């Protein structure tokens, strides 16, 4: 989507993670590999905050893409659809090796006028490492340009 500066999924953020979520059947999938700068205390594990970021972004991108699908439109078509996270519950199950490819899976479990809920799973090394329930709401275009005081 144009003009997306999100640190996790924004293509327009030169310092971001550039996470890209795509549909594979009835779920979304994203693949990403960490770098040493994203380490936890031990340098061989991914930081928990980074894990939360990729789960959050994958969940919200899934919700946005699902909204476009429900309207029969391509992602990014005007008028653009944007969502913002309202709640997220993360369960850290196992450490994530810093050099392992992370595979994210997203499944929409609820979508209505009050928002969208996505269940996300983070796998690495063939094992489930974390999971999250991400709730987001559709926001007006003015949300992207608002000044918060």
Where are these regions (language model features)?
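HotDog/MaoC-like acyl-thioester-processing domains
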Residues: 1, 94-149
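Non-catalytic linker/capping segments at the edges of enzyme domains
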Residues: 1-42
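Generic marker of residues within folded, mature protein domains
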Residues: 11, 20-22, 45, 80-82, ...
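Conserved beta-strand residues within beta-sheet cores
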Residues: 15-18, 29, 85-89, 103-105, ...
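A generic structural signal for short beta-strands and their flanking turns/coil linkers
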Residues: 26-28, 49, 82-88, 100, ...
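A conserved, well-ordered hydrophobic junction motif at loop->secondary-structure transitions
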Residues: 29-66
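Hydrophobic residues in beta-strands and at strand termini
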Residues: 32-34, 92, 138
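Hydrophobic beta-strand-centered segment that forms part of the acyl-chain substrate-binding groove
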Residues: 59-103
């Amino acid at each position: 989507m144009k003009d997306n500066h999100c640190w996790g999924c924004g293509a327009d953020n030169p310092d971001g993670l550039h996470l890209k979520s795509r549909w594979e059947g009835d779920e979304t999938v994203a693949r990403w590999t960490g770098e040493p700068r994203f380490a936890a205390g031990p340098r061989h594990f991914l930081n928990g905050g980074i894990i939360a970021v990729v789960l959050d972004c994958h969940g919200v991108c899934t919700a946005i893409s699902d909204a476009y699908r429900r309207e029969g439109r391509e992602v990014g078509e005007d008028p653009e659809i944007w969502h913002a996270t309202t709640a997220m519950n993360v369960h850290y199950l196992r450490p994530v090796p810093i050099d392992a490819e992370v595979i994210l899976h997203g499944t929409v479990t609820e979508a209505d006028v009050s928002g969208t809920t996505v269940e996300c799973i983070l796998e690495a090394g063939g094992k489930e490492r974390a999971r999250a329930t991400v709730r987001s709401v559709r926001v007006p275009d003015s949300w992207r340009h608002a000044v918060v005081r």
